[in-house]
Amino acid sequence: LLRLYEPTDGTIIYDGKVLFDKKEKIAVDMLPYRRRMQIVFQDPYASLDPRMTIGDIVGEGIDIHHLCANAKERHDKIISLLERVGLNSEHANRYPHEFSGGQRQRVGIARALAVDPEFIVCDEPVSALDVSIQAQVVNMFEDLQQEMGLTYLFIAHDLSVVKHISNRIGVMYLGKMVELADSFELIAHSVHPYTRSLISAIPVADPVT
């Protein structure tokens, strides 16, 4: 969708603009869209450069898009982003190996927010985290969405997480969209067998036996 890898088929339309169309051989330059569209990766360990400080990781997008006029403005923005995701100013000078998985994912989120995007692809952003940390990160995603007016494409296989954060849910099976509905409607009245199998895997606090 973000064309980090070139699609092999189909059409991508964003905000009414065709970004990619295989049949029509359309593939627009994505640079103008990089600020508007960002991604949070699944693996908080592999997605951060171990040779860079946290401050430089978060600041990389700021530098590429020339978003700050001077070093002080850049520094202040980086610290503000770290604090927004639950980290602090001291973390800016540290390296990824000094952090837990949950903290690294917060760094990844701060990096995505650094260019003030409007749309973020969240690619299984909590699947590699402990359950207790998952809840914290999902709640943070919700808070950031409210504060910044963000739109998420939240990719996950755990419907208990998806239903908590999503307004609409689309279910993919064998590479095709088999069901799309409002979150409550899909959970309450699913049609496709694969959707039902995902729902049946959601833990129930007080199951009736």
Predicted regions located by residue number:
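Helix-to-loop junction immediately C-terminal to a conserved catalytic motif
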Residues: 2
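Conserved ABC transporter NBD signature motif
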Residues: 10-21, 33
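Conserved ABC ATPase "signature" region
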Residues: 18, 72-90, 199-200
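Conserved ABC ATPase signature
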Residues: 95-99, 103
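A short, proline-enriched helix->beta-strand linker immediately N-terminal to the Walker B motif
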Residues: 114-118
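Short catalytic/signature loops enriched in Gly
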Residues: 182-209
